[in-house]
Amino acid sequence: MKIINEIYDRTIEDEELKYLRNNTCLLDIETTGFSREINHIYMIGLARLENDKIKVTLLFADNRSEEKDILIEFINYSKDVNRFISFNGLSFDFPFIKSRMNHNGIEYNFMEYEHLDIYKECKKLKDILCLGNLKQKTFESFLGIEREDSFDGGELIHQYKLYEKCNDEECYHNLITHNLEDVQGMVELLIILRYLHITDNIDNSTISEITNTNGEIVAKITTDYNIPKRFVIKSGFYYILFEKNIIKTILKPNSCTLKYYFDNYKNYVHLLNEDIIIPKQLLNDNNKNNAVPCKKSNCCIDVEGLYLPVFDKMLFEDEKLFKENLSSKETYVDISSKLNDSLYLKKYIIHIIKYRLN
């Protein structure tokens, strides 16, 4: 068994420190396959904060018979750990370790620890950030993190078998480099968690630079929350760019005619000769013979306007909401009178952001 210690020589940001304090340990394992029953753990990568530096410790089994040795060393290492941080550790690493400990007759209780699984926390970012997959290297690539290592965990199985067979130095280098960069990469990845908190204080942001050109509304929202890399959310009705602490928005309302449906349709009648809807209490001797009770499907009026979709009806419950027809699930607001209303536009833009990001 080998124990490799490295100091990850970089400045630790405050955002990272809040995750790494209080005896927190980052963990990543390498295995000879995906079956907990028949495959082995050949390396456990660990890292923790020591004297404001990240100290990485790799527990490496020179052969499969040393699996028990690195598991026991891992227990010794983690005696004063309060929390683990991993990437997909709750689904892979920790169940694998538990199974292999059982196989080796070692008792250990992972339920005593807190766990932060970056993969689990960030799964929803795949679509938001337009990532091709949820691999650690894909998140690192989005953040601009570069690696020396070019292997994935599956390819390293063959490298480990070669190392077991003939102590190949190149294979050893590849194995150590991969796990080292996996563990170091998790430190770098902590910043990705910022994307989960963009909306936390967004209601206190400010809106400015509102312009209305060629039917599009352009606005800038300034927040107190910085993100490391820009990204975009968009649809046919909006384009929203997030860059550092600025949110640049283009709203694209649809100029068309939609229907407004009255509540309590039984309280309305349809005047056939005038083709209008009126409340029953407005009936009189002059028009009652031309009136028929409204149905739910026709108790509406057509309204021309500039429409944008609504994703949270409760937020706009004091406004008229419009639809294409009664069975339409989509509802819209008419912003014709709100084009220069900065507070309203801010409210509308933030409601889109919360819908897409939360």
Question: Where are the model-predicted features located?
Answer:
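Short beta-strand scaffold segments in enzyme catalytic cores
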Residues: 44-46
